[in-house]
Amino acid sequence: VWCTAYFLFDFYCDFEEKLLLKSQLLHPEILAALAGGGHGAQVLIADGNYPSSTHAAPNARRVYLNLAPGTVSATEVLRVIAAAIPIESAQVMQPADGRDAPIFTEFRTLLPGLTLEPLERFAFYAQSSVPETCLVIATGEQRIYANILLTIGVIPPP
């Protein structure tokens, strides 16, 4: 599957005037990581404060979209990822006071039918560091506790 994503990327680079994918997701490294991930793999969308170099699986592919503060946002990334893959579950880093972070409302809107599972900060770090985490996307999101860990689901047969 990774070879297919690489072929598409290579083909796209050769013929830039043609849009090859119908999806909103066009980033070649993210496409390759998702294609290689499969059912049960995890994707971390990290805010601008998340220590993604030290608190994520060492073998996970890292994509840095944190061009500037606020760009690209965690919700922009989640919207595109959620449209591209089936999502089985979602975990969030819960603030120390136990309340929901304001961004959780937006996460719920983007993931209808899923319950956000809150994890204490260090439990979230531990879960993000398991070998099943195949992709870490560092965003420029400035809102705190805007980290979400997605588990890739399955597409049922027709």
What is the role of each PLM region?
Residues L21, L25-E29, G38, P69-E76, ...:
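Conserved active-site and cofactor/substrate-binding residues in soluble primary-metabolism enzymes
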Residues G38-A41, N59-A60, I87, P131-T133, ...:
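Short coil/turn connectors at secondary-structure junctions
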Residues N49-T54, N59-R62, A82, R108-T109, ...:
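Short, solvent-exposed amphipathic alpha-helical segments in soluble enzyme
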